[in-house]
Each structure stands twice: as structure tokens, then as C-alpha cells.
Amino acid sequence: MFRLFERLTWLAGGVLAMAGAGPAMAQETPKHGGTLTYMIPADAPPSLDGHRETTFATVHATAPFYSVLIRINPANPTATNDFACDVCTEMPVPTEGGKTWTFTIRDGVRFQDGTPLTAFDVAASWQELIAPRPGVTSARVTYFAMVESVKAPDVRTVVFRLKFPTSAFLPALADPYAYIYKKEILDRDPRWYETHILGSGPFRFTEYETGQSISGVRNPDYYHKGLPYLDGFHAIFADKQSVRIDAMRADRAAAEFRGIPPAARDQLVKELGDKITTQSSDWNCTNMITPNHSRKPFDDVRVRRALGLAIDQWNGAPALSRIANIKTVGGVVFPGSPLAATKEELQKMSGYWPDIEKSRAEARRLLKEAGQEGLKFELLNRNVDQPYKYVGTWVIDEWTKIGVHATQRVLPTGPWYDALRGGNFDVTVEANCQGLVNPVLDVGKLLPRSVYTENYGFFEDQKLVDLYQAMVFEPDPTKLRVLMRAFETYALDTQVHALVLPWWARIVPARSYMKGWKISPSHYVGQDLATVWLDR
């Protein structure tokens, strides 16, 4: 693998829009006690292992049970470079020119079974994340190409040695899925955590009913003194938005932490008044349509381009934004970032032309040229309504306007991931969502699967890799923007490896008695619930 992160400049995504419902409140004194009930908008996670999975269904269900080494500062979750220790004692100053990072691990941290968490557990967990043994999957191996070794010389010290200094290291280290597991268990069965839970976080695991609910109680041995405030939590899986909204309306649930569309927010506010609050943010997340290049006729760029030309993004996004969690037409970069394409730049690429009739005429011409008039195929989708199923229904309708007929196969989250990873699909609706806004890192999703394991296009493209590496090595923001346009144009227009659909907008509703939670541009961050409290 090439040196993916050498000299990477960590570029934030510009100003992140944040808003809350109602005026700012004075600082309140948190109260202890009570059980928080919240909704998880999915049927079930494919597994419980944070190292393996990339879905919110896993992190929303399991983050309260686990510790991490470092994280985005919980008091400042919109930041892209404000990091805080969790099981370490303080953020270290690197040595050897930024190539050695030495962390001191807290004393007194215990797993749920009462055994102490030591530096050996931290090192073992990170070794599995960075270089998993055969038969074990880590979804973020690519992020850690800069790491040479992770070692624990004693029970309180973990040392990361890097191949080269890079400002990408700390953001990668702060991944919210990077749970600390017990070394003894990893040594015995490295896949144990796919179906079991044993952590050292603010809550202790009590019960999991697959696809139904998961529960935890306050960890009395939690090392952040005074936390958590809650006695426990109960999370309910529900893939239908109507079920989740009804639960909040009837106060059977206090919150949903992923996001709802404006129409649902307006409905709740109208019906509940000051009994409901909402927080809003830009969302570092977008759906993509990914053709499986290993299946005909999707190995033909003419067919892939035709699918993109059929979709009227400029008129579709405003209409869908009222009923779905989508908002902004964009390319591969988070809108608002200095590296994002302007509207004029986007409209030069196929799939973004302002004249939809011209686009569709070209799409029909390409299909005829490729011998694919009347093309029929199956669109794989995830059984999550917001916004997956809305987006799937939309693009299927758009494709009929060029004579293409797709049927939608909707699978629960676990089987959907199995189909993606196994290549068992023609074309799929998927997403590119990240914990931090970092355009150069974020667009790695478009790289070939041999470089980025969570790419499901099943293609190889050395030129795309070379274009990406040119960005990685470019420190000048102006030149980097030019390189990003070249990467984007090649990926989305020249080769059409994927179709990027409108970026999402995040609205998180909560009963007004739920306090202590702050929104961020990522629905992965801030889900351990340690600071949440109930004002009742």
C-alpha cells in the first residue's frame, strides 16, 4: 500500500452550521438518576464489533459500554482538532520529530467483569484495528498506514511509533469506533466481540434482544468521577420513521440521535410545543449510487454515465429535502469546505448539467450505443428509511425517464452489508459518512477496494490512486483545490465510479427534559451518553 497519509494537511471543512430550537438556556445543574429511552433508526447492526463495522446502528447501540483512548472533546463536538483523553491521563507531546507518541493510561479503569484495564489491553485493541490477524476485519486499516508499531512497555504506557510524522494521526486515533477491548479475550477469540459486549465505559451491558432493543445500567466504577448522570438507558431499534415519531410523541422515547427530516421536526414541534427541542447541523454524510463494476453491463462507463445523467439533482434535492434528510447538491467534498466544488464547477460534470432534458437525451444515446436500451437491473438498498429508501425510490423513478427499469431489493442492515462485502448486487444505494470533516481523508471512500476496504465498486484504477496521492503530498491549499477538482472530475465524470447524491442535513429531536447532549456534524460522535441527564 502506498504511504497514504504522508505529509497530509488536516483541512477542516470550513464553518459548520449549527442551530438549536429556541433561545440559549443558562447553565443548568445536572441531575443524577433516571433511565433514558431512545430510538435507533435501524433494524439491527450486522455485528456488535466497533472495529469491524461502519454503521451507526453499531455505535448508537454499543458506544455507552466502551472506552476509547482519545476522542473529540465532548464539550466541543463540532471541532475537528480539539482532542481529549478518555483512558489516557493527558494528551502527549510527540517526540522524535512527531514520530513517537507516548500515552499514559489511567489507573483504576476496570472492565465490566471487574478486571483492570491496562496498557496491554489498549495496545492489543489498537493492534487489531491497525493490522488485524487473518480472518478478522478492521474497517479502518487504511487510516493507519502511517503507524509502524503499537507497544505497551508496561501496564501504564502505550507507545505508537509512526513511519513518518503526520497531522492525520490524532484525528484517526480519535475514531469513535476504536473501542478498547480486553486483551485476554482478543487472544482467545478475536471475533468474540462481534456477538458479545464487555467494556469499561460509562454503562454496563445488561441485555440485547437482536433487532429489538439493547440496555445498560450505570457503571459505578466509571473513571470520570460524577459520571454518568443516568441510572441506565434502553435503546429501541425501529427502522420505520413513523414508529420512531410516534414513540417520541407519546413519550415512550426521549430522543433519536441520528436525524429526522424537516417535515417530521415541524410535526413534532407543532404537536408538542415546548415539550420538544431540536438541534440542527450540517452533516458530513451523503448517499452514493455505486455500480458493481465486476458485473456487466456496469463495467461499461457509458452505462454508468447514463445512470447519472438521468438524475435531476438540482430540482430533486429541494423537493426531497422536506421529507428526507438531504439538502445540498455537491460533489465528493463536504459542501462549505474550501475544497468543495462550486455550483459552476459541478455543472461541468455529467450528472450535474443544468439542462436535464439535454442530460437525458445524452443518457439515452449512450445506452443505445452500448446496446443497453431498456436496461433492467436490481438496486440493492438498506432497510433504513431516512434517507436510503427515499433516495432509492427517487432514483428508480428518474431512471424510468431514460427507459431504464430497476427493481429495489431492500435488506436489513446486516444482510445488506454482507451483500456489499460479497459483491452480491448489480447497483447499490450506500453512503459516505465520516466522524470528522477532513476532505482528503473523506474522499478515500472512492479509492479502489484494494486500497480502501469499504469501497464496494469492485474496480481497480491506478490513475485514481495516483491522483489521490498527489493530494496527500500537496501542502498548498490553492494547489490542493486544483488537485481535488482533477480527482473529482476523473472519479465522477471520466470514469463514473459512483454517483454522489445530495448531502444530508441533520436535525436531532429530543424531549425537553433530556439535557447534556450536543449535536455534531457526525452521527457517530458523542454517543456514550455519559453527560446526558434527565430534568424531571
Predicted feature descriptions by range:
Residues 27, 31, 104, 117, ...:
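Surface-exposed binding/hinge segments that line
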Residues 39-96, 127, 196-199:
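N-terminal lobe/hinge region of extracytoplasmic solute-binding protein
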Residues 90-136, 153, 159, 244-247, ...:
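Aromatic- and charge-enriched surface segment that lines or borders ligand/interaction sites
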Residues 55-56, 60-64, 198, 209, ...:
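Detector for C-terminal structural segments
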Residues 114-116, 121, 242-253, 271, ...:
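Short helices/loops that flank or line small-molecule/ion binding pockets
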Residues 70-78, 171-228, 232, 242, ...:
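Gly/Pro-rich hinge or "lid" segments in bacterial periplasmic/extracellular proteins
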